[in-house]
Structures are given as structure tokens and as C-alpha cells.
């Protein structure tokens, strides 16, 4: 998808969806929509394997998805009031000691 091969990406995602008994993705997805669809599929396929949060952080979608979840559960907007400095994990102390050019992530 990121290299512009939308149809090829859609083919692979549709194979996964078909195996699960789901409908194919819509035919008219653009690159951003396909990226979101792929992130969602990864979230369902790899549930509880520890990838979802990191995928969302890497693509800048963590707060968006967390806020969607709160809206779904509570039926109204309840923005995530957690400390946004905790989106990134701390860099291990050993890594900081080995490389003085590293800067610790905000909030740690």
C-alpha cells in the first residue's frame, strides 16, 4: 500500500477477510483508507499479541483510536485524559548510558 500498490494490498486483505467469512473491502479505497483498513485488520488478526499499540503509535493514530473506543463504550465523547507524554515508551537506562547522544522520551 505505501508503495502505491493499492490493488495488490486489497487482494491480500480480502483473502484474509474471506478466510474469516467477511465481505471484501470496498473497491474505491485511497491510500489513507487502505492504510486504516490494514491497521484494523492487523488489530483483529493479531489481537492480544502486543502489536496494536505500537502500530497505532507508529502511524500517529493512537489517540484517535482510543477516543473512538471511549465514544463507543460510553455513547458520548470522553477524550482520553491520560498523560500524552506516555504515548512513547521510555528508552532503557542502559541504552542511554551507552549512547550519550540519545535523549529520553518526554515524561520519563
Role assignments for model-derived ranges:
Residues 1-108:
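Acidic/polar-rich alpha-helix caps and helix-coil junctions
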Amino acid at each position: 500500500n505505501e508503495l502505491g500498490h493499492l490493488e495488490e494490498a486489497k487482494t491480500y486483505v480480502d483473502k484474509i477477510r474471506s478466510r474469516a467469512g467477511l465481505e471484501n473491502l470496498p473497491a474505491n479505497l485511497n491510500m489513507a483508507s487502505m492504510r486504516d483498513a490494514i491497521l484494523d485488520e492487523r488489530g483483529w488478526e493479531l489481537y492480544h499479541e502486543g502489536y496494536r499499540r505500537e502500530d497505532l503509535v507508529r502511524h500517529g493514530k493512537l489517540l484517535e483510536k482510543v477516543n473512538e473506543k471511549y465514544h463507543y463504550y460510553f455513547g458520548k465523547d470522553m477524550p482520553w485524559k491520560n498523560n500524552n507524554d506516555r504515548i512513547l515508551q521510555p528508552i532503557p537506562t542502559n541504552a542511554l548510558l551507552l549512547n550519550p547522544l540519545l535523549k529520553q522520551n518526554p515524561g520519563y
